[in-house]
């Protein structure tokens, strides 16, 4: 099964969970500190909420969840053939899951991932969960973007 993923930055995770639970008449499929996702059947949507205070209501990234690693690898080949620069992450841990994925960047800077979940993880991943840092320095977030801290 394939479905579109929409990852949103939210100021208040609990308020966002309450709102989206009511909107889609569904409970989160996964809930961790600073993170939640919904696996909506109709319309087919993976909604990801990332608590990033001060950036609420903004897009974090977009994606397409696919059913297998073979599909991710086929997309890597297709996107490369189409002349798009790709960033591959195979067996990476991100968003409390081990995943195979490929990233591309749209002309407006919007980040898209094509990914499959291999297994759940108890850790968020190699990058910090939040875009903000206490010292205002840039930090890597899960989607590979460099984000500047709230005071920077």
Swiss-Prot record:
It comes from the Bacteria. Induction: By cadmium. PROSITE patterns: VOC. Residues 2-117 form the VOC domain. GO terms for biological process: response to cadmium ion. InterPro entries: Cadmium-induced_rsp (IPR052393), Glyas_Bleomycin-R_OHBP_Dase (IPR029068), Glyas_Fos-R_dOase_dom (IPR004360), VOC (IPR037523), YqcK/CadI-like (IPR049789). To B.subtilis YqcK. This is Cadmium-induced protein CadI. It comes from Mycobacterium bovis (strain ATCC BAA-935 / AF2122/97). The gene is cadI.
């Amino acid at each position: 099964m394939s479905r579109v993923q929409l990852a949103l930055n939210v100021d208040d995770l609990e308020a966002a969970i309450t709102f989206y639970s009511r909107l889609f008449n569904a409970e989160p499929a996964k809930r961790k500190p600073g993170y939640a996702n919904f696996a909506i059947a109709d319309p087919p949507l993976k909604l990801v909420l990332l608590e990033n205070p001060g950036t609420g209501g903004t897009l974090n990234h977009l994606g397409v969840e696919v059913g297998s690693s073979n599909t991710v690898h086929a997309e890597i080949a297709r996107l490369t053939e189409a002349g798009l620069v790709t960033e591959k992450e195979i067996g990476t841990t991100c968003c409390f899951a081990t995943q195979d994925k490929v990233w591309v960047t749209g002309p407006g800077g919007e980040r898209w991932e094509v990914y499959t979940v291999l297994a759940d993880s108890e850790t968020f991943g190699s990058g910090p969960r939040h875009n903000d840092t206490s010292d205002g320095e840039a930090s890597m977030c899960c989607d590979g973007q460099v984000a500047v801290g709230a005071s920077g």
